[in-house]
């Protein structure tokens, strides 16, 4: 997100200024790279919207048909809806900031985009963490009394935890307005027009940044990592046990366990990359036009799409529904020719 021009904060002793000396010749991307980046981002946004729209539609149809939705389906609906909104917002923001910078720079418009961006990102992080936690509780094989009690109550707790995550994300996004203020540092001409573009930086207090990082990103990140690692260890232990008792032929159950280990590992890697990219991007460590900042945007756009595709691929119900959809789409051209 672009920064805004505000008067420098007078309480300089209480502020940590993330100053990045901006040389336009060094930080501004070439027109070719800008076009390529926009094309990649657009492809990622559309892929993510389609994949998450499919997940939402399947579970909505399940809810209408069965008058209820499973706990995992409820989490997936929350996650998919937040990602559809997030990627639609990011696509709209790029369009407006590229075509009407003066309109985008208005206080109301800019803050609306910033609050929505932070809120939807944090919702997505929390929902994905709860999905990982739910799979861990339901699949992992531990015999501790507290764990067994949690497994028995998890389905009733999840709806409350999801709405609590929405409240935390919204409260935190509103709090971020006060710490993510920027001040105007430099300006340079835009070669394609007679106007000038300003370079902005953020002033974020150390305490606020720590709170911002820990509450918004680190807590769901730690929860996701712990749940994923414990699930992988449990599946690995059970896989080794089945392999020691195998008769020599391929065991479908063991192959399913191996597939679950791989899928969880992929989810973990994607989640970590996205969380790190989000923190770097929101912290304004690099200039808005730098290659590193662009890379963070690409990673943040790729995560919802790739994670949703893996969810469809590894979920039997979603995978079956996707194959049926492909089959129907394949038959439509034949029906039109008849």
Curated annotation (Swiss-Prot):
The GO terms describing molecular function are: bitter taste receptor activity; G protein-coupled receptor activity
Q: Which family does it belong to?
A: Belongs to the G-protein coupled receptor T2R family.
Spell out the SUPFAM superfamilies in the cross-references.
Family A G protein-coupled receptor-like
Alphabetically ordered keywords of this record: G-protein coupled receptor, Glycoprotein, Membrane, Receptor, Sensory transduction, Taste, Transducer, Transmembrane, Transmembrane helix
Q: Which GO terms describe its cellular component?
A: plasma membrane
Membrane-spanning ranges: 31-51, 75-95, 117-137, 157-177, 206-226, 263-283, 292-312
Question: What glycosylation sites does the entry record?
Answer: 194
The answer to whether keyword Cell wall biogenesis/degradation applies is no
**Topology relative to the membrane:** Multi-pass membrane protein
Question: Could you tell me what this protein is called?
Answer: Taste receptor type 2 member 39
Q: Other remarks on record?
A: Most taste cells may be activated by a limited number of bitter compounds; individual taste cells can discriminate among bitter stimuli.
Species source reads Papio hamadryas (Hamadryas baboon)
Q: Which InterPro entries match?
A: TAS2R
Per the UniProt topology annotation, the Extracellular ranges are: 1-30, 96-116, 178-205, 284-291
User: What compartments host this protein?
Assistant: Membrane
Outline which residue ranges sit on the Cytoplasmic face.
52-74, 138-156, 227-262, 313-338
Question: Is the Manganese keyword given for this protein?
Answer: no
The protein's job, in short, is: Receptor that may play a role in the perception of bitterness and is gustducin-linked. May play a role in sensing the chemical composition of the gastrointestinal content. The activity of this receptor may stimulate alpha gustducin, mediate PLC-beta-2 activation and lead to the gating of TRPM5.
